[in-house]
């Protein structure tokens, strides 16, 4: 095996293991929101996009409707469609199963690893290695987190309410940094989303404020058109 392939695999597996550990936090958060172990596992296996999963259980845990929970998850998941368009020429998967697998594993981390690779072959290797490691780790730790949370006492279970916002922020912050390189702008956008959610909380059904805050941040981060001649 060449040094380049070894380095690509090492980086992919390392990133996959690190990100996969968030699955334990999701499993605990899903339990706190009232989902059982199997429901948490099905979400991780079929949805497989961390920020959307945390948004969904966060809305459900706050008493929001299923429609609001799905809406917030879909809003956060739309970026994967853009990633898919970018990765399609690079991966060029053949066969129904490979295309379905590639589409399912199009997330932030696999996209970043694939497009950062120096050539197409290493890009494909980085995508599949990162996707496989994160997928296996995420689902395994989801089960462990849900099982561990279900065995906690009442006081400890109440403390799980802090998991959703903390893990949600940890997953979203790198995206916010990419959209807004300046630290001061990052803080203003994050604070603006929080203000939107707080102002709407007494006025709208539970969960709707989360969707509105996500929309506000997404609109703030949309690409700006440059003026002609600039």
Tell what function each PLM region has.
Residues 21-25, 38, 49-56, 79, ...:
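Transmembrane helix boundary and interhelical junction motifs in multipass membrane proteins
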């Amino acid at each position: 095996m060449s040094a380049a392939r070894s380095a690509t695999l090492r980086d992919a597996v390392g990133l996959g293991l690190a990100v996969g550990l968030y699955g334990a936090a999701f499993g605990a958060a899903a339990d706190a929101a009232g989902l059982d172990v199997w429901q948490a596992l099905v979400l991780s296996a079929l949805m497989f996009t961390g920020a959307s999963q945390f948004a969904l259980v966060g809305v459900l845990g706050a008493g929001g409707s299923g429609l609001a929970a799905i809406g917030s998850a879909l809003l956060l998941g739309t970026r994967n469609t853009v990633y898919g368009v970018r990765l399609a020429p690079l991966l060029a998967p053949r066969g129904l199963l490979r295309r379905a697998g590639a589409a399912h594993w199009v997330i932030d981390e696999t996209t970043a690893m694939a497009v950062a690779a120096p050539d197409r072959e290493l890009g494909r290797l980085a995508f599949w290695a990162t996707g496989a490691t994160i997928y296996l780790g995420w689902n395994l730790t989801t089960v462990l987190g849900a099982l561990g949370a279900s065995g906690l006492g009442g006081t400890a279970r109440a403390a799980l309410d802090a998991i959703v916002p903390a893990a949600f922020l940890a997953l979203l912050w790198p995206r916010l940094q990419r959209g807004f390189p300046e630290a001061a702008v990052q803080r203003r956008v994050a604070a603006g989303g929080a203000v939107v959610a707080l102002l709407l909380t007494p006025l709208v059904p539970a969960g709707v404020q989360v969707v509105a805050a996500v929309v506000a941040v997404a609109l703030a981060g949309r690409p700006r058109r440059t003026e002609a001649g600039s």
